Amino acid sequence: VKRPMNAFMVWSQIERRKIMEQSPDMHNAEISKRLGKRWKLLKGSDKIPFIREAERLRLKHMADYPDYKYRP
């Protein structure tokens, strides 16, 4: 069972698709670096919808898998 996505992962999933549409030849490592920089530059208020969605996913995950324990 996978862990629920955090706010960055929720946001980056959307943004990664946009970058890949614009620059299909860009390497995944470069996309990841750009996403990290852009996330850090986002204002807290712009992150709120993604934080809320991540919390919703976390609560759903807890309900779906009540005995789940993260084991790396």
Curated annotation (Swiss-Prot):
Q: Does the keyword DNA-binding apply?
A: yes
Instruction: Name where it's found.
Output: Nucleus
Q: Does this UniProt record's set of keywords contain DNA-binding?
A: yes
Q: Which SMART domains match?
A: HMG
A Gene Ontology biological process in which this protein takes part is:
camera-type eye morphogenesis
Provide a GO CC annotation, any one. nucleus
Chief site of localization: nucleus
Protein keywords: DNA-binding, Nucleus
* DNA-binding region boundaries: 1-69
The molecular function terms of the Gene Ontology recorded here are: DNA-binding transcription activator activity, RNA polymerase II-specific; RNA polymerase II cis-regulatory region sequence-specific DNA binding
Question: Under which name does UniProt file this protein?
Answer: SRY-related protein AES1
